[in-house]
Amino acid sequence: MYVPMVVEQSGRGERAYDIYSRLLKERIVFLGGEINDQVADLVIAQLLFLEAEDPDKDIHLYINSPGGVVTAGMAIFDTMNYIKAPVSTICIGQAASMGAVLLTAGEKGKRFALPHARIMIHQPSGGSRGQATDIMIQAEEILRMKRELNRLLADLSGQPVERLEQDTERDFFMSAEEARNYGLIDAVMTRRPDGGD
C-alpha cells in the first residue's frame, strides 16, 4: 500500500513525514479497515504514546472500519478507557460491528459521525471445526461475547439491553442521524470546528 509523504518546513529546513505520523502530531489516530491483532496493536501503541505526551489533551480517533475480531477490538476499547486522555471518536465512511462499538466507546459528548456515514451493529459471528465438545465451547464463548457486547452498547447508548438484544439479532444499519437518535453518537458533524478539535 502506498503511504503519502508530507513535507513540513521549519527553521531548520524541511522534514518529510508519512501522512500517519503527521496526523499523529495533531493527536489524530486513524482506524481504517478490518480490526485484527496487528491493527489493534498499532492503535493501542498510538493511544499510549499520545497519553504519555499529554494525558489531559483530547485524542481524535477517526474510524472507517467494517469491524473485525472482537478480542482485538476489545483490546482497543479497554485501552481507550484505561488511558487518562479523553478519546473523541469520529466515524467517516462506516463503523460496523466492532467499529461501531469503538465509535460508541468515545468520550461522552465527543462521539461524532459525518453526515453520510453508516453505522451498523449486530451480534458477533464465528466459525468452529473439530469435535462436538470443541464446537460447543466455541458456541458458548460467542454467546458470552454477544451478551457482553449488548450490555456494553446498552450502557454506552442508554438503550435498554432488551432492545440491543433485539436490534443486534441481525445486521442493524443506521444513518448518522439515526445513530445519534439511538445514542451511539452525540452529534452529526458537517464541518470540523475551529481549532481542529
Curated annotation (Swiss-Prot):
What PROSITE patterns has UniProt attached to this entry? CLP_PROTEASE_HIS, CLP_PROTEASE_SER
Transmembrane stretches in the record are: none
Enzyme class, top EC level, equals hydrolase
Positions of the catalytic residues? S97 (nucleophile), H122
Q: Name one GO molecular function term.
A: serine-type endopeptidase activity
EC annotation from Swiss-Prot or TrEMBL? 3.4.21.92
On the tree of life, the source organism's domain of life is Bacteria
GO BP of this protein: protein quality control for misfolded or incompletely synthesized proteins
CDD domains in the record = S14_ClpP_2
PANTHER family given in the database record? ATP-DEPENDENT CLP PROTEASE PROTEOLYTIC SUBUNIT
What this protein is reported to do is described as: Cleaves peptides in various proteins in a process that requires ATP hydrolysis. Has a chymotrypsin-like activity. Plays a major role in the degradation of misfolded proteins.
Q: How does it assemble?
A: Fourteen ClpP subunits assemble into 2 heptameric rings which stack back to back to give a disk-like structure with a central cavity, resembling the structure of eukaryotic proteasomes.
What name appears for this protein in its UniProt entry? Answer: ATP-dependent Clp protease proteolytic subunit
Lineage of source species? Bacteria, Pseudomonadati, Thermodesulfobacteriota, Desulfuromonadia, Geobacterales
Gene symbol of the encoding locus? clpP
